[in-house]
Every structure is written in C-alpha cells, then in structure tokens.
C-alpha cells in the first residue's frame, strides 16, 4: 500500500511482490503462474546454524544441546545491529502477519526481508489477517537478510549464515539464508516454546476436518505423508504442518502450505497440484524450455518445495481451525518393513511412540542428508523444532488425548514385504484406504491381533485394504528374516528410549525383547 522514499516496500500486494522479484532477477515465472526461485548451496534447513539466545527466560526452560544451541545476548545485539544497518542501506520489504490462527494464541509479526520473493513466501506461509494485531499484543520482529554474510570469528556464528531466536526481545534474526523454510520453522519454534505456558500443545502435524466436523491429526517428519494425506478431496484442510491443540480447539499456526514437490503428480496429489499457481513460490524446481515444472528432476535437490496460501486450496476450513481431534495418526516411514500398515495404540503406547518419533529421513529437509535414506528417532515427530524438554510435550499430549477421548493410531507409510531395497513401499492409495477406515470409525472396537516383539495390536480387517498386508510378517517370503528384522528394530527402539525418564507403564508399551 505504501512505499517510502528509501525503497522500503511495506505491505504491498502479492502481485507486486512477484513483479519486484522478477524485476530484480530473483526468480522467473513458470507456465503454471508460480514464481520459481533457487536457494543456492543451501537447499534445506541448516540445524548447525540455529541458535537460541541464552537469557533468564530461556536459561532453565530449554533442552540445550546439539539442536538448541545457546547464543550470547551481547553477541546477538551486535549482530542484529550489523544486519539491520546493512539491510537499511538497500531496498527491502516489510509485511505484517500473524502466526497462529486462534485469536487467543496469535503472535503479531513484523516480517522484514531483503528479497521480494522471501517476503512473498512469508505471506504464503504466515497468516494475512483482516486486521493486524487487533488485541494490541507485543510485536515480534523477523529480520531475514539473505545477502548478508556472517563472519564466524566476529559474529559468533557457525558459518556465513545463521538463524537466532531471542525470546526476551521477541526477535528472530536470519542472515545469509536463501532457503526460506528457515523463516517458517523459526516462528514455529517460537510458538513451540510459548504455547505450553498457555496449556496448549504445539504439534508438528497436519490436520483436516470431515463434513460431520470430525478432526484428524497427522503427525510425522518430512516426507512421511503429512501434506499428501491431509490434502484429501473429501475433507476440509485445516493445515499441513504446524498446529496447536488447546481445550476445545485445534488451530493452524500458519496460513499456508509448504509441500514437497519431488515426483508430484496431478493423479496422486490433485489438491497440491491445483494450488501451485500465480501467487505460489516454487523452490529449487527445474523448468523445461516451455517453463513447465519437471517435478521428477532432482538435479538441484530431493527437497524441492512449493509454498502456497491456504486460499489456493478449494476445500479448506474457513477459519484455519476446528474442534479437538477424533483421530490422532502418527505417520512413520519404516525402512525395515517390520511395522504394520496400521496399529491401534492405547494411551501408554501413544506416549511411547510420540516420544520415540521413529521414522526415516526421506528426501530430507536438512542439509547434507541428500544421498541415502536412513532411519531416525525424532522426538515428538519434530525434534528440531521443540525447544523445551520432550516430557513437557508428551505430558500435554496425553492430557489432551485423555480429556477428549481421541483415538490414536500408528500408520506405516514405509516398506512392507522386506526392508528398503528388498520389499516395496506402501502405495498412496493403500495408505489412503487405511486413513479412510480410521476416519469412518471402522477401527474403533475392531478385533485385533497382537504382534509380539514390536508389541503392537493390528486390526484383523480394514475396509478397502488387502487383509494379507495387515500383519507384516505375512508379507515376507522369509518369516525367519522378518523375526530377525523385528528384533533388530526392537533393539533400536529400546536403546533410543533409555534417555527418557517416564513411568514403567510407558516403558512397557514399546517393543520388547
């Protein structure tokens, strides 16, 4: 709307941001109307470059370590001033957005970026409110200057780029980072620290809502199927990645989606396909001579992405929120082929598997993990984004599940009939069949079979899913090899779980040898 003399573009429209990005050579238009950009040598998040300022409010509240690295307050002040002065000497872009769709829990954010495209990205992913900050809350500031190069010896950073959260000053500093996912996840981490103080569980999950108002949550790491499975043409999307669960409400922290694009097809993912149009941003997607995206081309990265506002999704929850969840689904991509396509969990098992967060890094979003696919345990299905000790989030989850009576399921979107390289991955229609059965209530009170070693209960029948797939041992040609693989996986679970101090009932809910 306004443009000052010193080329500060404040709250200009998405169309103007696209225009500015192209004028400045930041990207190009694809045939489908989206803005296509490249993020340079960083095509994923850089966990080693992320810090939290250590000060009285964070000192004893954060699980410090490799994920949450402390940063000195004085160094932060010096670096913020340096980056801000650098940015003030060039054209830049400012937008005012909200993070958190529920009125009680939103954060007002002044987002300043050096590039037009990253501002557009923020406008896609965060919430553009009808009225900015109606409750007059204290404002957060995000300063994202991609062309600033940090000097580790001077600035105290790990490399030429950094992401630093300062809770005392309500500031997020992002410097030297072209991969825009850093901005989205930084504000997610902020809410993940703040929401538990309000008795709200922050979650790395997708959420959708049925015609009858029933809500389903999909927890999972990148690449396990959150975005794909929640984008269901028969249901209304609340969001694909970040939510809060408070008394009586599940709300989106964001106002957009950040979908993986590798091998995207109109047939398997029609909702996402249609959402990629003018106003959307494609990161590291290769175009052909006609400017048509080639989603199968992974020459830049496996982690190619599309950012688009929820307005691009036809069937969506108008207010970005819904009631409490009837079904809570933990998505795991099991490389070993040991886990069943669906297991029904009790409360103790829910706590165990939430804390474990077992899955695979598939086309990982983290730098340097491009080549192989490997198994991992990521607490709360999103360890990089949860600053407090894991127990805080697990206790809140169990409290919410018990209070509302949500049913919890573990769904394997990974391998069956053998491990990675031997078996085959469950196809999307099979997993959609499992999800549909869960959402219809068909598995509530279903007859189950207990699987020893991995200590899970599987339904004996799931409408629309081949019965021989339900017990994974049946899908292996070599049953002895399955038993060995199950023992190997159980050992990994037990070893990983040693770090948690929890009740014996929760410990006993996991795999047993």
Swiss-Prot record:
It holds the Pfam family PEPCK_ATP. It is found in: Cytoplasm. This is Phosphoenolpyruvate carboxykinase (ATP). Mn(2+) binds at residues 185, 204, 241. GO terms for cellular component: cytosol. Its cofactor is Mn(2+). It catalyses: oxaloacetate + ATP = phosphoenolpyruvate + ADP + CO2. InterPro entries: PEP_carboxykinase_ATP, PEP_carboxykinase_C, PEP_carboxykinase_N, PEPCK_ATP_CS. It is an enzyme of class 4 (lyase). Belongs to the phosphoenolpyruvate carboxykinase (ATP) family. ATP binds at residues 185, 204, 220-228, 269, 305, 431. Binds 1 Mn(2+) ion per subunit. Substrate binds at residues 45, 179, 185, 305. Pathway: Carbohydrate biosynthesis; gluconeogenesis. Its EC number is 4.1.1.49. The gene is pckA. GO terms for biological process: gluconeogenesis.
């Amino acid at each position: 709307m306004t443009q000052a003399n010193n080329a500060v573009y404040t709250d200009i429209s998405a169309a103007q941001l696209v225009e500015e990005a192209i004028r400045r050579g930041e990207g190009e238009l694809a045939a489908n109307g989206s803005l296509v950009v490249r993020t340079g040598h960083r095509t994923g998040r850089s966990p080693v470059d992320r810090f939290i300022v250590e000060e009285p409010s964070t000192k004893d509240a954060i699980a410090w370590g490799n994920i949450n690295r402390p940063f000195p307050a004085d160094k932060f002040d010096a670096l913020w001033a340096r980056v801000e002065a650098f940015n003030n000497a060039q054209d830049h872009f400012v937008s005012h957005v909200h993070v958190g769709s529920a009125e009680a829990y939103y954060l007002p954010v002044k987002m300043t970026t050096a590039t037009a495209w990253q501002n557009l990205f923020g406008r896609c992913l965060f919430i553009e409110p009808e009225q900015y900050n109606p409750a007059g809350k204290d404002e957060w500031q995000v300063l994202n200057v991609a062309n600033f190069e940090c000097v580790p010896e001077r600035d105290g950073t790990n490399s030429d780029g950094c992401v630093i959260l300062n809770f005392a000053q309500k500031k997020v500093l992002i410097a030297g980072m072209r991969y825009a996912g850093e901005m989205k996840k930084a504000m997610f981490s902020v809410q993940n620290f703040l929401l538990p103080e309000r008795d709200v569980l922050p979650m790395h999950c997708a959420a959708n809502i049925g015609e009858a108002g029933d809500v389903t949550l999909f927890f999972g790491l990148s690449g396990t199927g959150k975005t794909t499975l929640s984008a269901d043409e028969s249901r209304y999307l609340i969001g694909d990645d970040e939510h809060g669960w408070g008394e009586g409400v599940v709300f989106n922290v964001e106002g957009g989606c950040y979908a993986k694009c590798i091998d995207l097809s109109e047939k398997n993912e029609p909702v996402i396909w249609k959402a990629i149009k003018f106003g959307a941003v494609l990161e590291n997607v290769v175009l052909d001579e006609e400017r048509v995206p080639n989603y199968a081309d992974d020459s830049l990265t496996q982690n190619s992405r599309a950012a688009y506002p929820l307005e691009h999704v036809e069937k969506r929850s108008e207010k970005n929120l819904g009631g409490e969840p009837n079904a809570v689904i933990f998505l795991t991509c099991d490389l070993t082929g040991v886990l069943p396509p669906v297991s029904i969990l009790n409360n103790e098992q829910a706590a165990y598997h939430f804390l474990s967060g077992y899955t695979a890094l598939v086309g990982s979003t983290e730098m340097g993990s491009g080549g192989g696919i490997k198994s991992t345990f990521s607490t709360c299905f999103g360890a990089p984004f949860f600053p407090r000790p894991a127990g805080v989030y697990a206790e809140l989850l169990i409290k919410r599940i018990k209070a509302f009576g949500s049913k919890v399921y573990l769904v394997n979107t990974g391998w069956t009939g053998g491990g990675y390289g031997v078996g085959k991955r469950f196809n999307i229609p099979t997993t959609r069949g499992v999800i549909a059965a869960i959402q219809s209530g068909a598995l509530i009170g279903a007859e189950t079979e207990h699987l020893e070693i991995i200590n899970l209960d599987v339904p004996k029948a799931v409408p629309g899913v081949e019965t021989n797939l339900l017990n994974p041992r049946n899908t292996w040609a070599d049953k002895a090899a399955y038993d060995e693989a199950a023992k190997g996986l159980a050992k990994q679970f037990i070893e990983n779980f040693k770090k948690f101090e929890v009740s014996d009932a929760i410990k006993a809910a996991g795999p047993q040898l």
